[in-house]
Amino acid sequence: MGVEQPLGDNIVTASLDGLVNWARKSSIWPMTFGLACCAIEMMATGAAKHDLDRFGIIFRASPRQSDCIIIAGTVTKKMLPVIKTVYEQMPEPKWVIAMGACACSGGVFDTYSVVQGVDEALPVDVYIPGCPPRPEALLYGLMKLQDKIGKERNSFGSAIGLGDRLEPAA
């Protein structure tokens, strides 16, 4: 959140986009969707050694309380509808992280029953390669997602009654 203009000692102005993006990136609540070996590394990332809480990242078990889903492991064609349903239950804005070679590209499983990358069904924001990726890699991926969220451009016109107008009303 960049400071645009200091006013005196106690007042700081900033853009609404910057303020909202700062709040969103500082409180990511991912839902864990561990399907294979990568889930163990995801659990290790949530342990005390790496301390995700210091980044405002708290794992949630319900998609209705999450704004990010971490898909970790082999996604089969039978599991894909479940992942889509969980994704649709998440409120907007929502982000997707593909963790591990299997979630990113199908991994070593080049077969009819394995989805060759979860990006065939969901819009993936961050890819974390590895088999399985280390907890530090997941932490780095989450920090990259925070950077991406911080640079997003939002349109809050509809929230204050302006709709999608680009020009002021006459």
UniProtKB/Swiss-Prot annotation:
Reaction catalysis annotation: a quinone + NADH + 5 H(+)(in) = a quinol + NAD(+) + 4 H(+)(out)
GO cellular component: plasma membrane; respiratory chain complex I
A biological-process GO annotation: electron transport coupled proton transport
Annotated binding of [4Fe-4S] cluster, by residue: 37-38, 102, 131
Presence of the UniProt keyword Transcription regulation in the record: no
Cited function: NDH-1 shuttles electrons from NADH, via FMN and iron-sulfur (Fe-S) centers, to quinones in the respiratory chain. The immediate electron acceptor for the enzyme in this species is believed to be ubiquinone. Couples the redox reaction to proton translocation (for every two electrons transferred, four hydrogen ions are translocated across the cytoplasmic membrane), and thus conserves the redox energy in a proton gradient.
Protein name as annotated: NADH-quinone oxidoreductase subunit B
